[in-house]
């Protein structure tokens, strides 16, 4: 990202990928798919994404999943924690609960009880 024009182009490409991620957050996302959307090689995409976002693609996607899961915990009381975990692509509720607690410092069940 040496000049302003290429930096703007890179930002536009990354924004396009971010929009795609947000629209497909509950679906499996692959590096191949996302790098193709950005029009970069996998290696270049991963490097540019981290340079712009200051977090890896995996960290970004996990953070978005956890942030969106909070709304589900509060407003989708018809869904169990396991249902929410599976909806956002976690392999099971234990993996989801561990990631949630690491990020929010509270378990998903306690979060739901405190805020719903």
Where are these regions (language model features)?
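Key DNA-contact positions within bacterial/archaeal DNA-binding proteins
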Residues: 43, 93-94, 109
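…primarily DNA-binding HTH/wHTH and HhH modules…
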Residues: 1-8, 12, 74, 98-116
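Residues within the alpha-helical elements of helix-turn-helix
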Residues: 37, 87-88
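The short coil/loop that forms the "turn" connecting the two helices of the helix-turn-helix
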Residues: 40, 90-91
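Short, polar N-cap/turn motifs at the start of nucleic acid-interacting alpha helices
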Residues: 82, 92-93
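Terminal helix-turn-helix DNA-binding modules in bacterial transcription factors
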Residues: 15-32, 52-87, 115-116
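Glycine/alanine-rich phosphate-binding loops at beta-alpha junctions
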Residues: 1-47
């Amino acid at each position: 990202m040496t000049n302003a024009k290429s930096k703007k182009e890179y930002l536009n490409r990354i924004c396009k990928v971010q929009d795609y991620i947000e629209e497909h957050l509950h679906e499996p996302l692959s590096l191949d798919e996302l790098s193709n959307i950005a029009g970069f090689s996998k290696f270049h995409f991963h490097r540019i994404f981290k340079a712009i976002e200051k977090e890896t693609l995996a960290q970004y996607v996990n953070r978005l999943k956890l942030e969106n899961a909070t709304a589900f915990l509060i407003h989708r009381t018809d869904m169990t924690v396991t249902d929410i975990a599976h909806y956002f692509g976690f392999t099971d509720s234990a993996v989801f609960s561990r990631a949630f607690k690491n990020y929010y410092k509270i378990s998903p069940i306690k979060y739901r009880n405190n805020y719903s």
